[in-house]
Design a protein with these regions (language model features):
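N-terminal pre-core extensions flanking Radical SAM catalytic domains
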Residues: 1-26, 248, 252-256, 261, ...
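Conserved alpha-helical substructure of the radical SAM core
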Residues: 1-81, 88-95
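Hydrophobic faces of well-ordered beta-strands that scaffold small-molecule active sites
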Residues: 5-9, 53, 80-82, 104-106, ...
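A structural motif
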Residues: 49-50, 101, 147, 174
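Active-site beta-loop-alpha junctions enriched in small/polar residues
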Residues: 58-60, 85-87, 109-111, 155-157, ...
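Anion (oxyanion) recognition and catalysis
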Residues: 74, 98, 142
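Structural recognition of alpha->loop->beta junctions
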Residues: 92-111, 168-179
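Radical SAM enzyme [4Fe-4S]-AdoMet core and its adjacent flexible, acidic
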Residues: 113-287
Length: 303
């Protein structure tokens, strides 16, 4: 029996931000056509039991054929999710496209504009996305695509390790909050090694936010229980259950295809992943056999 896979497609590396904490630093500048990505999708489906494709970048909303590619995947009967910084999203886009996605994930490393500028999570003019704008976008997704799940990805570095974001997460009622430790990289003059966090600093950041989240969830459950008693309801009132996923180490735990169409393996060196399969030329099934994948870590992320 084939094992189910969720496959990350980094359809381009270009981005309108320059985040130092971004882990999508593969040194790939290629822009494959929609037809090429369709071939890769078909290759993946032929070689594995694919449960979902997760579209990422760079900033995937910069890709000119995004909607066409997503529709192609959906027509194959496979779910699609999107990871975005949200800067190019507006109400019209949400009305037209949000319903196509299983999950829309926003990359939010800080709710402080100055911290975002230090991280590089801003445009060339230094304009960052206000936290309130992400709240608005999430509200619009809830309005126009209520079945779409909302996820927040937060990458922790020395620049934001002391921040508590649980109140923000609570405000947008995120279904999932992924807290990741920043992946170190150094390509020529570009490096983030000076803003790494220690094991202890990362764990402290996670626990600080997890504890605040727990307190809020307990208070919410108490309020909902009181409402249920007052209403005399026979059936329990559904309470939001926010899932927090912590990733201190991303090695050997992703099935990831870069913007060149290559399946990458980062088990040996996280800073320099190795291409184990050109998915436009080789069978994806063969690439999977060569890929180092820690099934326990991989399945813990998605289950």
């Amino acid at each position: 029996m084939k094992k189910k896979y969720k496959i990350n497609l980094h359809i381009l590396e270009a981005c309108n931000f320059k985040c130092r904490q971004c882990f999508s630093k593969f040194g790939t500048k290629k822009l494959l056509s929609v037809k090429d990505w369709e071939k890769i999708v078909d290759n993946c489906i032929a070689g594995a039991d694919v449960a979902e494709f997760i579209i990422a970048g760079g900033e995937p909303m910069l890709y000119p054929g995004l909607a066409e590619l997503v529709q192609y995947i959906r027509d194959k009967g496979v779910k699609v999710s999107l990871i975005t910084n949200g800067s190019l999203m507006d109400e019209e886009w949400i009305k037209s496209y949000a319903g196509m996605y299983e999950t829309i994930g926003f990359s939010v490393d800080s709710i402080n504009d100055e911290t975002n500028r230090k991280i590089g999570r801003c445009d060339r003019n230094g304009k960052a996305i206000p936290a309130g704008r992400i709240v608005e976008l999430c509200g619009l997704i809830r309005k126009y695509a209520p079945e779409c799940r909302i996820k927040i990805n937060t990458v922790v570095s020395a620049l934001n390790k002391d921040e508590v974001m649980s109140a923000f997460i609570d405000e947008i009622t995120a279904d999932r909050w992924k807290i990741l430790r920043m992946k170190p990289f150094q390509y020529g003059s570009s490096s983030n090694l000076d803003i790494q966090v220690s094991d202890e600093e990362f764990e402290e950041c996670v626990e600080r936010n997890r504890e605040k989240n727990k307190e809020k969830m307990e208070k919410q459950e108490e309020k909902e229980a009181e409402k249920e008693v007052r209403a005399g309801a026979k059936a329990g009132i559904e309470t939001a259950r926010r899932e927090i996923v912590v990733e201190p180490d991303m090695k050997a735990s992703y099935v990831l295809i870069d913007s060149n169409g290559c399946l990458l393996d980062n088990a040996v060196d996280e800073m320099t992943p190795v291409a184990v399969c050109d998915c436009l030329k080789e069978a994806f099934a063969e690439g999977l056999r060569r890929l180092t994948l820690d099934r326990e870590k991989y399945e813990a992320r998605y289950n």
